[in-house]
C-alpha cells in the first residue's frame, strides 16, 4: 500500500479547514488498554486549552486515573465523559492515546478520522495495514518531539533505577550497592548508546556514584559526554569486540541503542552472556524485537524479569508507564502544540505551517481518499 504526505487541501479529509470556525472538531481521549500502561497523553490542563479553542472534548472514563487525574478534573476542564472506546471512535474527529492501537481497535477506525498515537510501524505491520485499509489519517506520536521525547528521558532515568532494583539479591542480582560502601566497590555499569535515553540513564547512575562507561558509534557524542562529566566517566566506540572486552568486569548493561530493522547481528549474543558474572543485569530499554540483545524477550511490569545464563534480564516495554504522573505531564505538554495546530487549522494547513508535523503524517495515497468535510 502506498503511503505519503498530503499536500493539498483538496485531498485531505476531516479537519482540513484553514480557519478556526471551519475546523472546529470533536477531540477524543482514549483510556490506554496496553498491559501495564498507566499514562495519558492529555491531562485536564490540555483539555481546558482545547475546549477554550472552541472544540468539543470527549474523555473516556478512567483515561487519566492511573496517572493521578480523576474524571471529575476532566469534567471541570470542560470535557464530556463517555464510557467506552467505541463511543470515542464513533463520535470523535480526532482520537488520541499513548500507546499503539490494539487489534480490537482496528475495526473502529474510519475514513478521514485523525489518529494521533505511537505507531512504531516497523514493529507493528498489522497496525499499519489496518490504518491504510481504514483510510484514517495517522500521526506517529513517537516522532513528534523536536528536542527529544520526554518518554525517552523517562525511560532512561527510570530504566536505570529498575536496573538497580534488579541488582538486589532478592531479585536474583549480585546484591551490589550502586555507589559501593565503606570497603566495598561501586557498581560498574555499561551504557550502550549515548542518545537521549542513554544520557538520561547516565545522569542518574553518575549522580548515584556508579562507575560508568558509555559506548556509542559517534565519537563526537563521546567527547561531549567526557567534557560534560569532567572526565569522570569512560567512553568507548560501540563494537561487539569492545563490549566483549568489558563484560567480565561489568555488573549491569543498559541497552539504549535503537536497532535497525532487518539487522541480523547482535551487540550481545547469547554466547556473550557467559562472559558476565552470575547475577549481573541487562536492562533492555530499547526493547526491539531482533534487536541488539539476542536473549531479549518483552516483559511486563507484573512480571518484569527473567534469568538466562545466570544474567537477570529486565525487558519491560513501557518503562515510563511506571512513573505515569510525571511522564503524562511532560508528554502532554510536548504534544499539545501539535494537537492545537491540527484542531485549529486542519491537517493540510497545520502541515503547511509546520513542516516538522509533516514528518509524522501517515495516510493512504491522496488518490485513494476523498475529502469528507
Task: Provide a role label for each language-model segment.
Residues 15, 21-130:
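An N-terminal-biased, well-structured beta-alpha scaffold segment characteristic
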Residues 123-140, 281-312:
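Rossmann-fold NAD(P)-binding glycine/threonine-rich loop
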Residues 142-162, 166-177, 292-363, 367:
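Adenosine-phosphate binding glycine-rich loop
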Residues 101-115, 262-278:
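Rossmann-fold NAD(P) dinucleotide-binding segment
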Residues 88-101, 240-265:
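Rossmann-like NAD(P)-binding element
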Residues 15, 26, 32, 106-186:
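Glycine/serine-rich phosphate-binding loop and adjoining beta1-alpha1 elements at the start
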Residues 37-52, 58-59, 177-250, 255:
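Glycine-rich phosphate/diphosphate-binding loop of Rossmann-like nucleotide-binding domains
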Residues 1-8, 361-368:
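Conserved small/polar residues in nucleotide/adenosyl-binding loops
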Amino acid at each position: 500500500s502506498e503511503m505519503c504526505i498530503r499536500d493539498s487541501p483538496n485531498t485531505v479529509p476531516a479537519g482540513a479547514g484553514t480557519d478556526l470556525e471551519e475546523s472546529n472538531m470533536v477531540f477524543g481521549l482514549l483510556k490506554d488498554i496496553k498491559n501495564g500502561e498507566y499514562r495519558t497523553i492529555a491531562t485536564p490542563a490540555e483539555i481546558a486549552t482545547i475546549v477554550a479553542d472552541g472544540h468539543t472534548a470527549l474523555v473516556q472514563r478512567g483515561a487519566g486515573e492511573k496517572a493521578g487525574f480523576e474524571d471529575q478534573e476532566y469534567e471541570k476542564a470542560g470535557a464530556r465523559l463517555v464510557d467506552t472506546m467505541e463511543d470515542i471512535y464513533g463520535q470523535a474527529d480526532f482520537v488520541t492515546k499513548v500507546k499503539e492501537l490494539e487489534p480490537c481497535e482496528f475495526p473502529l477506525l474510519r475514513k478521514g478520522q485523525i489518529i494521533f498515537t505511537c505507531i512504531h510501524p516497523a514493529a507493528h505491520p498489522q497496525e499499519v495495514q489496518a490504518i491504510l485499509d481504514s483510510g484514517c489519517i495517522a500521526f506517529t506520536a513517537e516522532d513528534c518531539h523536536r528536542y527529544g521525547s520526554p518518554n525517552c528521558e523517562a525511560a532512561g532515568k527510570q530504566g536505570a533505577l529498575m536496573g538497580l532494583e534488579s541488582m538486589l539479591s532478592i531479585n536474583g542480582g549480585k546484591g551490589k550497592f550502586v555507589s559501593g560502601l565503606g570497603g566495598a566497590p561501586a557498581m560498574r555499569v555499561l551504557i550502550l548508546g549515548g542518545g537521549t535515553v542513554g544520557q538520561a540513564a547516565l545522569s542518574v547512575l553518575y549522580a548515584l556514584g556508579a562507575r560508568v562507561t558509555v559506548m556509542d558509534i559517534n565519537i563526537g557524542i563521546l567527547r561531549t559526554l567526557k567534557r560534560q562529566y569532567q572526565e569522570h566517566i569512560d567512553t568507548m566506540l560501540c563494537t561487539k569486540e569492545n563490549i566483549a572486552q568489558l563484560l567480565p568486569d561489568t555488573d549491569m548493561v543498559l541497552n539504549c541503542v535503537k536497532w535497525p530493522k532487518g539487522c541480523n547481528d547482535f551487540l550481545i549474543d547469547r554466547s556473550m552472556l557467559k562472559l558476565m558474572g552470575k547475577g549481573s543485569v541487562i536492562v533492555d530499554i530499547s526493547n526491539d524485537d531482533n534487536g541488539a540483545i539476542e536473549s531479549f524477550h518483552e516483559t511486563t511490569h507484573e512480571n518484569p524479569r527473567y534469568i538466562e545464563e545466570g544474567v537477570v534480564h529486565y525487558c519491560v516495554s513501557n518503562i515510563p508507564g511506571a512513573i505515569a504522573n510525571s511522564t503524562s505531564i511532560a508528554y502532554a505538554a510536548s504534544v499539545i502544540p501539535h494537537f492545537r495546530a491540527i484542531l485549529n487549522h486542519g491537517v493540510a494547513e497545520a502541515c503547511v505551517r509546520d513542516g516538522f508535523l509533516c514528518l509524522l503524517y501517515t495516510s493512504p495515497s491522496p488518490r485513494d481518499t476523498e475529502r469528507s468535510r
